[in-house]
From Swiss-Prot:
GO terms for molecular function: glycerol-3-phosphate O-acyltransferase activity. It is an enzyme of class 2 (transferase). Belongs to the GPAT/DAPAT family. It is found in: Cell membrane. Transmembrane segments: none annotated. The keyword Lipid metabolism applies. Its EC number is 2.3.1.15. It comes from Mycobacterium tuberculosis (strain ATCC 25618 / H37Rv). Pfam families: Acyltransferase, GPAT_C. One of its GO terms (cellular component) is plasma membrane. Was identified as a high-confidence drug target. The lineage of its organism: Bacteria, Bacillati, Actinomycetota, Actinomycetes, Mycobacteriales. This is Glycerol-3-phosphate acyltransferase.
Length: 789
């Protein structure tokens, strides 16, 4: 028989060693015996015994031989028995180096798994490609060390329980040796259920829950466990490419960010928190880790996605399905919390959406703290000296789901997930080209930095802990936003939405977009490759054409030159793309509105400017992320630095403010923020004669009706603000202003709030008129240039 390759770590050095051989076939035992013969030849004075390691679910009788080998009296003296070294050994089988994508899929078929070949296949491999067989040894441990660990960590007392503990430790050591050869992407937690159920810590917590049983906890662990397999890991990239086949096959990464994250993951476990715009995000993160040969992530997902064949397959590739609405189930909450803690303690990486659900508006939602609090508990309990919160920005040139999101905005119901839904989803990915997927990894946030050292003060102060969690989560989300590149899709959609259905030519699109690109360059904001191409007319044409055919732009070719516009029915879809870039223009838009407000203010206009900037920040805090108030003021001051002696000119007011705004490039507030204040104003109008404690559903229904009336009357500029999604945050604003609760002066305050919003919309009109004057002047200059030619 041809000799297989042996791992460099598979060398025995102790004087008395018990080799635990994990084998499935006689072929594997032959290979291990051959390897053991080499060890004996190298160390003729050492004692090597070999015992077949019982399988995981073996009956108690199968452990008898191991129990005897572990008994102190089995060796020549009790002390020498305790000093005996235990070394687990296994044969691993590597897949063919030239395996195709089809071969990875075929591995799901019975008898085609390259990692677990049949005995007949093993003999053929040894004849034709013996290097595919590797004898590996796990880390050794003395019997005394294992016995101490067993006593310290488990509730068991019987010698057979100790043998089971040693067996589990052997399998875990072999798993670590295996992924060192296969690669970090195959790293996964093993034997989670038996390890946790045997844990003294876990049992102690279980005893504190009334009516809780080990059996029920075990069933919940079965539900949570991933059942990881190498074949499923290989399929992650295949399925990921299938689900995203409408996009460029190569994801767009920042290689410096990837290198920094690789170094960070070598030092600490991490939670990868990704922005969530599409179901595709769930495959983007695992594929991104595989692309860059990084350790895998164990993704949390709703149990509603565990259907058909996809459920088992996704479990085996690292998906952890969790139940919804677990507040009334203390046992499930406890098991989930301990499961998260166990995975973190074993230095495996977790991942979920920081927003908790897909953002159907295109902008980031507030972070959810549920799972984060479990990770924080694990950290504060000392299960890791630090845990990194690694943000992941995922953005797309286009998404087919925007049609669905537009329907939600108009009041449609969510489509339930299932096999038919999955088929239609994957089918839609291949209907056209959606551009690129951009994945960014901003600098990670340290849990230690925000929560202090483990076992610190926060463990005894729930309120302080929650505040620290909120600040930490917002910092992660803020870093995600700062790393998210601005796309051509977002810029073109934002521009065309401002025309309210009026078409623009290629030249008009091109020259108007340049101010935005100049601003992004000055701010050194990240931009996508598609946005960089907007510097050329060809790049603008490509971006506009990619959005054409109602996706969501309409192109008209019947005249002298093509023109592009957004039809009213497509405004909600286009808004998704526009909203995805607002973060890059948020503060400069607030500057414009604060200047417009100061123009009409009495008294100290500089003070009025700052007061209005902070007021706008407060009103928009439910829709957007902001820097803290000190940093925000500094950012606003920096935005104003483009105008020399701006405070002096602002103090003069009148035409000076007109000139300041006319000189500002670009003017973005109307394009970026108007629709949100129109939605707020619709809700404020509904509240004028609504009951004090009106419910959210009734308020939304009334706002939809009134909003449609306002559209018909031209009292709002488009149908875009008539959106259930925008009304949801508008209600939050009203609650924050204490306008949905009984009070003596409620009616007066509701009227005053509506008046305030109308004044802000008046400021939008003022800025919009100046922006229109800029556009006309630019058009006139461009025509003069063309006429001279």
């Amino acid at each position: 028989m041809t000799k297989p390759a042996a791992d460099a770590s598979a060398v025995l050095t102790a004087e008395d060693t018990l080799v635990l051989a994990s084998t499935a076939t006689p072929v594997e035992m032959e290979l291990i015996m051959g390897w053991l013969g080499q060890q004996r030849a190298r160390h003729p004075d050492s004692k090597f015994d070999i015992l077949k390691l019982p399988p995981r679910n073996a009956p108690p009788a199968a452990l008898t031989a191991l129990v005897e080998q572990l008994e102190p009296g089995f060796a020549s003296s009790p002390q020498s028995g305790e000093d005996r070294s235990i070394v687990p050994v296994r044969v691993i089988w590597l897949p063919p180096a030239d395996r195709s994508r089809a071969g990875k899929v075929a591995a799901l078929l019975p008898g085609r798994d390259p990692y677990h070949p049949s005995q007949r296949q093993q003999r053929r491999i040894l004849r034709t490609d013996p290097r595919r067989a590797r004898v590996v040894a796990g880390e050794s441990a003395k019997v005394s060390e294992l016995r101490q660990q067993w006593r310290d960590t488990t509730v068991a007392e019987h010698k057979r329980d100790f043998a089971q503990f040693v067996s589990r430790r052997a399998l875990l050591a072999l798993a670590r040796a295996e992924y060192r050869i296969l690669g970090p992407q195959y790293k996964s937690p093993r034997l989670v259920k038996p390890e946790m159920l045997a844990s003294a810590r876990f049992r102690a917590g279980l005893d504190r829950i009334p009516g809780a049983t080990v059996e029920d906890a075990g069933k919940m662990l079965d539900e949570l466990s991933t059942g990881w397999s190498q074949v499923s890991v290989d399929l992650v990239s295949v399925l990921g490419r299938l689900a995203s086949r409408g996009f460029d096959p190569e994801f767009d990464y920042d290689e410096y960010q990837v290198a920094a994250m690789r170094a960070a993951l070598e030092a600490h476990p991490a939670v990868l928190l990704f922005s969530h715009r599409s179901y595709i995000d769930g495959v983007v993160v695992p594929v991104a880790m595989q692309d860059n040969r990084l350790p895998p992530v164990h993704m949390f997902g709703g149990i509603n996605l565990s259907f058909g064949l996809m459920g088992p397959l996704m479990r085996r590739s690292g998906m952890i399905f969790i139940r919804r609405n677990i507040g009334n189930d203390p046992l499930y909450k406890y098991v989930l919390k301990e499961y998260v803690g166990y995975v973190v303690e074993k230095r495996f990486n977790l991942s979920w959406s920081i927003e908790g659900t897909r953002s159907r508006t295109g902008k980031m939602l507030p972070p959810k703290l549920g799972l984060m609090s479990y990770v924080a508990d694990a950290y504060l309990d000392g299960r890791s000296d630090d845990i990194l919160l690694q943000g992941v920005s995922i953005c797309f040139d286009q998404l087919h789901e925007i049609t669905e999101y537009a329907a939600y905005a108009r009041g449609a119901e969510k489509t339930p997930e299932g096999l038919r839904w999955l088929y239609n989803f994957i089918k839609a990915q291949g209907e056209r080209n959606f551009g690129k997927i951009y994945v960014r990894f901003p600098e990670a946030v340290s849990m230690r930095q925000y929560l202090g050292a483990p076992h610190g003060e926060l463990t005894q102060d729930p309120a302080a802990k929650r505040l620290a969690l909120q600040k930490m989560s917002f910092e992660v989300a803020w870093r995600i936003l700062q790393a998210t590149p601005v796309t051509a899709t977002g810029l073109v959609s934002a521009l065309l939405l401002t025309t309210r259905g009026t078409a623009l030519t290629l030249d008009q699109l091109h020259h108007t977009l340049q101010d935005s690109l100049d601003y992004l360059e000055r701010k050194q904001s990240p931009v996508s490759t598609s946005a960089l191409r907007l510097r050329s007319r060809e790049g603008v044409r490509a971006a506009a054409d990619a959005l054409s055919n109602g996706h969501p732009v309409t192109r008209v070719d019947s005249g002298r030159e093509p023109v592009w516009y957004i039809a009213p029915d497509d405004e909600h879809a286009a808004a998704f793309y526009r909203n995805s870039v607002i973060h890059a223009f948020l503060e400069t838009s607030i500057v414009e509105l604060a200047l417009a407000h100061a123009k009409h203010a009495e008294g100290d206009r500089v003070a009025a400017f700052w007061a209005q900037a902070m007021r706008l920040r407060d009103l928009l805090k439910f829709d957007f992320y902001f820097a803290d108030s000190t940093a925000f003021r500094a950012n606003i001051a920096q935005e104003m630095a483009w105008h020399q002696d701006w405070e002096d000119h602002l103090g003069v007011g009148g035409n000076e403010i007109d000139a300041m705004l006319y000189a500002k490039r670009p003017l973005m507030s109307d394009a970026m923020l108007r629709v949100f204040f129109e939605a707020y104003e619709i809700v404020a109008d509904v509240l004028r004669d609504a009951p004090p404690d009106i419910g959210p559903e009734e308020l939304t229904e009334l706002a939809l009706g009134l909003g449609r009336q306002f559209v018909a009357q031209g009292r709002v500029r488009s149908s875009e603000p008539v959106s259930t999604l925008l009304f949801a945050t508008a209600r939050q604003v009203a609650v924050d202003q204490e306008l949905i609760a009984p009070a003596a002066d409620l009616a007066e305050r509701r009227v005053a709030f509506r008046r305030e919003l109308r004044n802000i919309l008046r400021d939008f009109d003022y800025v919009e008129q100046i922006a229109r004057n800029q556009f006309v002047a630019c058009e006139f200059k461009a025509r003069q240039g063309r006429d001279r030619i």
